[in-house]
């Protein structure tokens, strides 16, 4: 019975992963066509935590390979000199940058990292339709796009970029 259960679980997981991949690709193509509209970013402080006086904050956007525009908060240490190590931060599925991932990013910036906390595709201020879809494939691509974006930032040491999420 134990072997049958493990086989059933493995088959179900494989089916879900395959179906998720196909759905992600299809949804990504649909989103790419719909992403021509601009994001409606808020520029006032909208987090559940106070802004640190040790960092500068600004909103940035970047696009993943599916054409979905991602919204992010960038935190830069005020005492920054030279090229900085960088970290891209995002929370679990359904979380937004105004919550814990933003707090982690800001705290890491206080410690000398240039950071971004971004909303994954289909979530928060980022683009993508339908809304509130969770796709492991696209989430992975979002992190790749975040690393690519950070590597183009003038203040970032492209050899020292990490992710957290």
Which ranges hold each PLM region?
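Short beta-strand element of the alpha/beta-hydrolase
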Residues: 83-92
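The serine-hydrolase catalytic nucleophile loop
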Residues: 94-106, 120
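Conserved alpha/beta-hydrolase
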Residues: 107-125
């Amino acid at each position: 019975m134990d072997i049958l259960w493990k086989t059933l679980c493995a088959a179900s997981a494989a089916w879900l992963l395959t179906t998720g991949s196909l759905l992600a690709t299809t949804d990504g193509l649909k989103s790419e066509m719909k992403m021509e509209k601009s994001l409606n970013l808020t520029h006032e402080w909208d987090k559940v935590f106070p802004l640190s006086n040790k960092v500068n904050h600004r909103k940035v956007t970047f696009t993943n390979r599916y054409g979905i525009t991602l919204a992010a908060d960038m935190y830069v240490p005020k005492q920054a000199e030279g090229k900085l190590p960088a970290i891209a931060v995002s929370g679990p599925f359904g979380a937004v940058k105004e919550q814990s991932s933003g707090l982690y990013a800001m705290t890491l910036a206080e410690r000398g990292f240039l950071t971004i906390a971004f909303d994954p595709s289909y979530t928060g201020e980022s683009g993508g339709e339908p809304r509130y879809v969770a796709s492991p494939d696209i989430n992975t691509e979002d992190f790749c796009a975040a690393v690519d974006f950070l590597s183009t930032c003038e203040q970032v040491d492209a050899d020292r970029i990490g992710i957290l999420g």
